[in-house]
Amino acid sequence: MVQSYEDMLKAAYSGIGEPTETGERFVMPKAKIYIEGKTTVLENFSDIVDSLNRDKDHFMKFILGELGTAGKIDGNRAVFNGKFEQAQFDAILETYVGDYVICSECGRPDTKLVKDDRVLMLLCEACGSKRPIRKRKAKTEVQGPAIEEGKELEVHIESISKKGDGVARIGKYILYVAGTKAGQNVKVRITRISGQVAFTQKIL
């Protein structure tokens, strides 16, 4: 049975912490960031890449696309132009793991990226399943309603954060909605905006 994208995300996040083939548990790496002048530094970039077992250039390109900025790899860290929030990196990391690391069939991280007739696929070395990588639009191409504090709007919950809040996206903004589930459409009120992160209150 073909799973919906929401079901795939649920399988990805429920699979985090499950034993790998070696018997070790996969632990979602935590981004360690700090502001340095007009830039944001991801201090443990190399550690995250090693933990995910992915190519550093592929991971870096993904982050740059999600943040809509420029940056560079500097030794074991990565530097991004602009000031960004911890919540943004947490959401980006969760999205990357769901799309490019966790098997949607067995929920394990024992996977690798392969090309099959020019199509990028995620091949699971644990259960043997293979699926195409979901194409994502660059954030600069995504348009949405204007975001401002106090505004009410309807959003689609794409995934669930590590803290249990629903994650939605409107244009360049990441919205957190407490008390929701992946796949839901809910009406919310914007309570606070910090950079490209918006905090909301669900309207009952």
UniProtKB/Swiss-Prot annotation:
Residues 146-204 form the TRAM domain. InterPro entries: IF2/IF5 (IPR045196), NA-bd_OB-fold (IPR012340), TIF2_bsu_arc (IPR004458), TRAM_dom (IPR002792), Transl_init_fac_IF2/IF5_dom (IPR002735), Transl_init_fac_IF2/IF5_N (IPR016189), Transl_init_fac_IF2/IF5_Zn-bd (IPR016190). It comes from the Archaea. GO terms for molecular function: translation initiation factor activity. Keywords: Initiation factor, Protein biosynthesis. Belongs to the eIF-2-beta/eIF-5 family. Heterotrimer composed of an alpha, a beta and a gamma chain. eIF-2 functions in the early steps of protein synthesis by forming a ternary complex with GTP and initiator tRNA. NCBIfam families: aIF-2beta (TIGR00311), PRK03988.1 (NF003067), PRK12336.1 (NF008993). This is Translation initiation factor 2 subunit beta. It comes from Methanocorpusculum labreanum (strain ATCC 43576 / DSM 4855 / Z). The lineage of its organism: Archaea, Methanobacteriati, Methanobacteriota, Stenosarchaea group, Methanomicrobia. The gene is eif2b.
